[in-house]
């Protein structure tokens, strides 16, 4: 079995880093934050150091912040006409569930809901 796995790695059919990068793209498509993406990668079997490294690279390129803003825009559209406190609470809840950090959520909420 080890020889087969080694051969698959050698020919490029098994590449953990490419898989992790693909999984991060999937997470961003679902508007997840850094913490949520790391947890999702770990759930999918990516070892934690690799998951954190790939997510750090994605964070540096700003994709998680972009995802938070898109989440905020969608939340604002869905809750239009509701009480402002309800709108903020729903946004914060969804952002927290998706693993966004409080600093980013605060900036988005201030801009879109205040």
Predicted stretch roles:
Residues 1-114:
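An alpha-helical, amphipathic repeat domain used for nucleic-acid recognition
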């Amino acid at each position: 079995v080890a020889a087969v796995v080694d051969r698959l790695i050698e020919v490029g059919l098994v590449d953990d880093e490419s898989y992790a990068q693909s999984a991060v793209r999937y997470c961003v498509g679902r508007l997840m934050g850094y913490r949520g993406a790391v947890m999702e990668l770990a759930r999918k079997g990516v070892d934690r150091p690799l998951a954190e490294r790939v997510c750090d690279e994605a964070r540096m390129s700003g994709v998680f912040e972009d995802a938070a803003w898109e989440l905020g825009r969608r939340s604002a559209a869905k809750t239009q006409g509701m009480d402002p406190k309800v709108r903020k609470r729903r946004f914060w809840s969804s952002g927290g569930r998706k693993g966004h950090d409080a600093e980013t959520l605060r900036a988005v909420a201030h801009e879109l809901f205040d």
